[in-house]
């Protein structure tokens, strides 16, 4: 994957999540472009959010954990048959939150990060904390970087 400068400190917050079989299954799900899995995108968002929140003096643990689980929807979003009745763009945060609640104990900040990460596309899911705004911004930035970087 990537060579993160502060990998060990970051892993203190997320290693338990990363060892979960459902989180690992995200490696099999495509994300924004070919060759990038939902897992790899989520780790990149999580790490970037953790660094920014740590620098800002915010809850870096919540940013790391919420960032890792922000796309924990567990279906192939490119295959409509794998998620019947779900409008992926607007509803996947709710699916991700439901899946995360079923497997992990979440703080209110982690829940808000997952639920509001698509704002303003989901205009009724406004950030309730700064960590959510950071993760949402890092999600959009990472998606743009993944789309535009050479293969």
Where are the regions a protein language model picked out?
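All-alpha prenyltransferase/terpene-synthase fold signal
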Residues: 2, 6-9, 119-124, 142
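Acidic/His-rich, divalent-metal-binding segments that scaffold phosphate/diphosphate chemistry
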Residues: 1-79, 85-86
């Amino acid at each position: 994957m990537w060579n993160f400068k502060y990998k060990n400190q970051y892993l203190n917050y997320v290693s338990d999540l990363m060892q979960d079989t459902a989180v690992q299954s995200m490696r099999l799900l495509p994300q924004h472009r070919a060759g990038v899995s939902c897992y790899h995108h989520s780790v990149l968002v999580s790490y970037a959010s953790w660094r920014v929140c740590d620098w800002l003096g915010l809850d870096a643990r919540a940013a790391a954990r919420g960032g890792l689980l922000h796309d924990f929807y567990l279906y192939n979003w490119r295959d409509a048959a794998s998620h019947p009745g779900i409008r992926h763009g607007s509803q996947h945060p709710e699916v991700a939150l439901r899946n995360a609640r079923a497997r992990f104990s979440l703080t209110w900040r982690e829940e808000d990060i997952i639920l509001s990460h698509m704002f303003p596309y989901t205009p009724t899911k406004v950030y309730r904390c700064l960590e959510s705004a950071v993760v949402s911004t890092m999600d959009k930035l990472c998606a743009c970087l993944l789309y535009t970087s050479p293969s």
